[in-house]
């Protein structure tokens, strides 16, 4: 199964009136997410995905755009995505079936990637890592990394 790890796009700064949890995407952040999501949609070739997102506003907005572009079956908010504990995510979220996308924050995504496939990338804003994951063996292989700056995805024949 595919596990898609996605970081939110650029968010408004935290202020006295806007808490970290309430920070939404900027217009630029929305464009970043849409571009990355469209690249992912071409990669997935119309396979529907299930989306799980952290409860923060910027990740929920990111998940909404991802759902529009990538044939999402459903979006779930998951507090588990606010912690770097892959085993908890695996036990509460993962199941056989269609690909799933986990929309979260930079340090947690890096931790999940390192734990699942011993790979490390710096997650850019709206960056997406695609893991081919084997639930039985509890391990995966990083097979793709996309950013909003990528203009075209070379298709395999």
Label every PLM stretch briefly:
Residues 2-78, 109, 119-126, 157:
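Active-site-proximal alpha-helix that buttresses catalytic centers in soluble enzyme cores
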Residues 16-18, 89, 142-143, 154-157:
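Short aromatic-enriched loop/helix-cap "lid" or pocket-rim segments at secondary-structure transitions
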Residues 43-46, 94-98:
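Glycine-rich phosphate-binding loop signature in dinucleotide/nucleotide-binding domains
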Residues 78-80, 145:
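Conserved beta-strand termini and adjacent loop/short-helix elements that scaffold enzyme active sites
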Residues 82-93:
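Short alpha-helix plus adjacent loop in nuclease-associated cores
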Residues 95-101, 106-126:
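Non-DNA-binding regulatory cores of transcription-related proteins
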Residues 117-143, 148-153:
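Domain-level recognition of soluble alpha/beta enzyme cores
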């Amino acid at each position: 199964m595919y596990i898609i790890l996605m970081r939110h796009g650029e968010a408004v700064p935290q202020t006295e009136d806007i808490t970290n949890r309430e920070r939404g995407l900027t217009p630029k952040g929305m464009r970043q997410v849409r571009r990355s999501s469209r690249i992912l949609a071409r990669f997935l070739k119309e396979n529907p995905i299930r989306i799980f997102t952290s409860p923060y506003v910027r990740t929920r907005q990111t998940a909404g755009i991802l759902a529009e572009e990538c044939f999402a079956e459903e979006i779930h908010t998951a507090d588990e995505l606010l912690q770097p504990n892959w085993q908890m995510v695996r036990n509460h979220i993962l199941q056989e079936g269609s690909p799933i996308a986990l929309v979260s924050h930079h340090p947690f995504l890096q931790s999940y990637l390192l734990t699942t496939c011993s790979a490390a990338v710096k997650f850019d804003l709206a960056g997406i890592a695609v893991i081919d994951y084997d639930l039985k063996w509890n391990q995966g292989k990083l097979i793709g990394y996309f950013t909003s700056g990528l203009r075209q995805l070379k298709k395999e024949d």
